[in-house]
Amino acid sequence: MQFHSSSALITPFKKDLSVDEAAYETLIKRQIFQGMDACVPVGTTGESATLTHKEHMRCIEIAIETCKSTKTPSNSRMKVLAGVGSNATSESLSLAKFAQKIGADAILCVSPYYNRPTQQGLFEHYKTIAQSVEIPVMLYDVPSRTGVSIEVPTALKLFREVPNIKAIKEASGSLKRVTELHYYEKDFKIFSGEDSLNHSIMFSGGCGVISVTGNLMPNLISQMVNCALKFEYQQALEIQNKLFDLHQALFVETNPIPIKMAMHLAGLIENPSYRLPLVAPSKETIKLLEKTLQQYEVIA
């Protein structure tokens, strides 16, 4: 996986709640021009749980088409880490095959949610999906949403026994897990899935981030990651601290509710629309977001 900084893309909707494909393409191009290495369509932040199978595939397709047709400032191509997660192994497998077929660079697969599989079930789930494709696979551990964690021994076993399982997105909130994973397998790539811990994870064995805040501030997230990769601890910490208030504001309600409203307030999307059961943020949250965006000089 030849990338380090990436954003977990929002999925913009029109007023009728259909996917706004033109806005989606524009958001991806902004990521490209502001220095991100990769984009991550249809993950948690992309509201994948309320997209149809057809919409899910179309979002991956748009991301790949846009990245292939738009050069980065360094004349390279931004990578696509396609979200293929589902609580049904068969559906994830179908999405994984589709993503590979149309040119995804790698796939991100969240643990099955709601059904709460055992560790053996998680192992078989990921093994089955990974063996159906040849491109790299990134595990995604976010127990606060899935109800079950990929325990460290299970993650290590998957890395050791399934050749194309190369990385894990860590959104468990546990630095102990990160240090343990890195201690036992230095080549197992760890990506931060917690914006508030980006700096800490990068300096505890992490090699990159998948950021929600990056939707709004891709340039600063990219700069922080690049500083960390060069072991410029203080410079990376300064950027992390600079982003602290924004990280806090963007998670005051369930993600992606605040980030979509923030993107709207910043003039980056026309409609801050959500599909039920997600709803618009409270008036208090909107005021907080406005104040925070003013603090960062995003809005006047």
UniProtKB/Swiss-Prot annotation:
Active site, UniProt feature: Y140 (proton donor/acceptor), K169 (schiff-base intermediate with substrate)
Classification via SMART domains? DHDPS
Protein name as it appears in the record: 4-hydroxy-tetrahydrodipicolinate synthase
- Major localisation: cytoplasm
Which enzyme class, named as a word?
Answer: lyase
Subunit structure, interactors included? Homotetramer; dimer of dimers.
Q: Which GO terms describe its molecular function?
A: 4-hydroxy-tetrahydrodipicolinate synthase activity
Its annotated compartments are: Cytoplasm
Corresponding gene?
dapA
HAMAP family given in the database record:
DapA (MF_00418)
Question: What is the top-level taxon of the source organism?
Answer: Bacteria
| PANTHER family membership | 4-HYDROXY-2-OXOGLUTARATE ALDOLASE, MITOCHONDRIAL (PTHR12128:SF66), DIHYDRODIPICOLINATE SYNTHASE (PTHR12128)
Q: Which Pfam families match?
A: DHDPS
The record's section on SUPFAM superfamilies has:
Aldolase
Q: In which pathway does it act?
A: Amino-acid biosynthesis; L-lysine biosynthesis via DAP pathway; (S)-tetrahydrodipicolinate from L-aspartate: step 3/4
Family per similarity comment: Belongs to the DapA family.
**What keywords were assigned to this record?**
Amino-acid biosynthesis, Cytoplasm, Diaminopimelate biosynthesis, Lyase, Lysine biosynthesis, Schiff base
Residue ranges crossing the lipid bilayer per the database entry? none
Annotated NCBIfam families: dapA (TIGR00674)
The record ties this protein, via PROSITE patterns, to: DHDPS_2
